[in-house]
Regions:
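Amphipathic alpha-helical interface elements
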Residues: 1-182
Length: 184
């Protein structure tokens, strides 16, 4: 990262973060086609940096501090990616946003400038996201099926009712066991 200019650094950190959040969400979500479609592909509802930040925070996958840092990075990224003008991380509004970032929790040296601050802060954050994603997988902390079916009221002949209920129970059992197999 040290060889990148300011724009390259910001865009790279944002792209790495967006990708890491997408992987975190996929690791956490049920392992099915619908989950992948939420994250990947054209017009995916959770395909943007902003939506991934909000989804991870609302699901409890990132802390409030991490959420705030990612939102700051997103705002800084937008300034660099939506402008052809010569802008800098030393510009007053961008500099204030960088100063508002949390300090790296794995580096004991105080950053010398805004370039080092954002690089170290977001690099630390990316490591934390990677570790959390790994722990979700290792400790089987994936989302679990909580939906259920309800059998209310009966009509028709007794034998038909019993057979219908048995089919429903078997279907529920299959739903639950197929999900359990995916998390092992």
């Amino acid at each position: 990262l040290d060889s990148l200019d300011e724009r390259g650094l910001i865009l790279s950190l944002a792209a790495f973060s967006e990708d890491a959040l997408g992987k975190m969400l996929l690791t956490f979500m049920l392992d099915n086609k619908a989950s992948k479609e939420l994250i990947e592909g054209f017009n995916a509802p959770l395909g943007t940096f902003s939506s991934r930040i909000k989804a991870c925070f609302s699901l409890g996958l990132i802390t409030e501090g991490q959420y705030k840092d990612l939102e700051l990075l997103r705002k800084i990224r937008n300034k660099f990616s939506h402008s052809w003008e010569n802008i800098s991380i030393e510009d007053q509004d961008i500099s204030q946003q960088i100063k508002a970032l949390s300090f790296s929790r794995i580096d004991f040296e105080c950053p010398k400038d805004n370039y080092q601050k954002i690089k170290k802060s977001i690099s630390c954050l990316l490591i934390e996201i990677k570790i959390t994603t790994s722990q979700i997988k290792k400790k089987h902390l994936k989302a679990r099926l909580v939906g259920s079916n309800v059998n209310i009221g009966f009509s028709g002949k007794y034998e038909e009712q019993v057979n219908d209920i048995k089919k429903n129970i078997e279907s529920i059992k299959n739903d639950l066991t197929s999900h359990d197999k995916n998390i092992k």
